[in-house]
């Protein structure tokens, strides 16, 4: 099989694992046995040509609430494990969908985007991102490789970003002080 076949099969497997993780972690709020079924179907755009200001965006995986879809973009600079093949990355993006469904009621353009004052800190988005990092890490605990607090490391070339997103960092934890 060629690279894209392996990548798509890996992405499919990782989305299945992420769905199972959320099905196990989040009980059905109505106790009707649905679990994470509310996030189905998982729509995925693979190797998508996404443009921002006319430039193609590469080296990323996203959940885009306004199209209710995951977008796996072509890689260019990231030459390690492709993002679709990294369970932590896929679980991280799935966590964004869960947050959109559970906290934002499936809003295509969540209210916090419209009311954001442009400052570099947005509490709700930061909470979404932090929870996504936690779930990206937690989903890796189900695999043979065990828990990977630096789940971005196999895929990401930027050591600074990997270190910043390392969920085992004590200095990044919020305290009561």
Placement of each model-derived feature along the sequence:
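Zinc-dependent metallohydrolase catalytic domains
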Residues: 4, 8-91, 99-177
């Amino acid at each position: 099989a060629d690279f894209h076949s392996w990548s798509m099969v890996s992405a499919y497997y990782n989305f299945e694992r992420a769905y199972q993780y959320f099905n196990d972690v989040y009980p059905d709020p109505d106790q009707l046995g649905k679990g994470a079924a509310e996030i189905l179907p998982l729509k995925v755009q693979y190797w998508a040509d996404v443009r921002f200001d006319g430039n193609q965006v590469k080296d990323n995986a996203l959940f885009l609430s306004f199209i209710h879809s995951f977008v796996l973009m072509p890689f260019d600079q990231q030459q390690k494990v492709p993002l679709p093949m990294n369970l932590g990355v896929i679980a991280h993006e799935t966590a964004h969908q869960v947050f959109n469904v559970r906290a934002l009621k499936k809003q295509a353009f969540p209210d916090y985007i419209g009311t954001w004052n442009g400052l570099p800190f947005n509490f709700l988005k930061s909470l979404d991102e932090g929870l996504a990092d936690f779930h990206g890490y937690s989903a890796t605990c189900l695999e043979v490789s065990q828990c990977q607090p630096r789940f971005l490391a196999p895929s990401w070339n930027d050591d600074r970003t990997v270190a910043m997103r390392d969920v085992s960092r004590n200095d990044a934890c919020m305290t009561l002080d």
